Amino acid sequence: MAFAPKTSSSSSLSSALQAAQSPPLLLRRMSSTATPRRRYDAAVVVTTTTTARAAAAAVTVPAAPPQAPAPAPVPPKQAAAPAERRSRPVSDTMAALMAKGKTAFIPYITAGDPDLATTAEALRLLDGCGADVIELGVPCSDPYIDGPIIQASVARALASGTTMDAVLEMLREVTPELSCPVVLLSYYKPIMSRSLAEMKEAGVHGLIVPDLPYVAAHSLWSEAKNNNLELVLLTTPAIPEDRMKEITKASEGFVYLVSVNGVTGPRANVNPRVESLIQEVKKVTNKPVAVGFGISKPEHVKQIAQWGADGVIIGSAMVRQLGEAASPKQGLRRLEEYARGMKNALP
């Protein structure tokens, strides 16, 4: 779904964004129309479901999940990686890849599916397979922009007792070992349940909040800045050009280009409009553009890279490797084989 705040003229947008140290218009405008809050009472809705659902998301918060059993134990702490292997901010990582003419490999997995011990191993495995950035989903009781594969993954994670606290505890142990940055992807309610300082302390480098209500954009953007976290925003084929410009100005780390209107999940083919969408975004920003939704085959990532994307995001197809396995051990083997195949398909 596309968010629907009042639009502004392109000239006023351009002039408002001249001051480099000021929050982008998308964020700054809301500070004059909403009472600032330290917690995040709303945000930028840039999903691809219906307009009615977008309106509902701006004023409602998903119900809390039912009481769940205690999460699986986190693996024992291991020695931190050497200093030269410590992860860098997302923007630095993407800039280094662009300078080399490389396309970023950005896999997504759900924390806690099937348990957090397996998630910790999956993070290490993906890092070893050459992931440039890892998106880690924090389960939410109403993952409404996601398709059946990720919804089922989220349900398994919640059933295993996965909570934000448990995810952050696991990340404190694992992120010192990783050479690539981790970006948390979750919905509004889980993100607002903890301070951003806790997330940064756990080794998180960025955030993606797909149902971020529009009126909380300024407060979240500002607090993310204060905690050296990069807030990645999404744009979709349904977003008008003036709104897309606002999003690209505000997004940090990279611009997340959703390839299709609809929910997550593998597609047989890449939307042919993605080529022109990439160029439209690149006309208004020099920030990296990463494409996600529906990508599941080596030929998909090759095509998207040829069209000029700076990164390729693979979610449901990654989640399926763990979710459809007979055991965590088998799932990790499947994940490694699949991840290496997708990584090797990129230039």
From Swiss-Prot:
It holds the Pfam family Trp_syntA. Residues 8-27 have a biased composition (Low complexity). It catalyses: (1S,2R)-1-C-(indol-3-yl)glycerol 3-phosphate = indole + D-glyceraldehyde 3-phosphate; (1S,2R)-1-C-(indol-3-yl)glycerol 3-phosphate + L-serine = D-glyceraldehyde 3-phosphate + L-tryptophan + H2O. One of its GO terms (biological process) is L-tryptophan biosynthetic process. Coiled coil: none annotated. Residues 1-53 form a transit peptide. It is found in: Plastid, Chloroplast. Residues 64-76 have a biased composition (Pro residues). Pathway: Secondary metabolite biosynthesis; 2,4-dihydroxy-1,4-benzoxazin-3-one biosynthesis; 2,4-dihydroxy-1,4-benzoxazin-3-one from indoleglycerol phosphate: step 1/5; Amino-acid biosynthesis; L-tryptophan biosynthesis; L-tryptophan from chorismate: step 5/5. One of its GO terms (cellular component) is chloroplast. GO terms for molecular function: indole-3-glycerol-phosphate lyase activity; tryptophan synthase activity. Its EC number is 4.1.2.8, 4.2.1.20. Residues 1-38, 64-89 are annotated as: Disordered. The alpha subunit is responsible for the aldol cleavage of indoleglycerol phosphate to indole and glyceraldehyde 3-phosphate. In bacteria, tryptophan synthase alpha (TSA) activity is almost completely dependent on formation of an active alpha2beta2 complex with tryptophan synthase beta (TSB), and indole is usually not released during tryptophan synthesis. In maize, the TSA homolog BX1 catalyzes the formation of free indole from indole-3-glycerol phosphate, independently of TSB. HAMAP family: Trp_synth_alpha. Mutant rescue experiments indicate the existence of a second tryptophan synthase alpha gene whose product might be involved in tryptophan biosynthesis while BX1 might be restricted to free indol production. Belongs to the TrpA family. Tetramer of two alpha and two beta chains for the tryptophan synthase activity. Homodimer of alpha chains for the indole-3-glycerol phosphate lyase activity. PANTHER family: INDOLE-3-GLYCEROL PHOSPHATE LYASE, CHLOROPLASTIC, TRYPTOPHAN SYNTHASE, ALPHA CHAIN. This is Indole-3-glycerol phosphate lyase, chloroplastic.
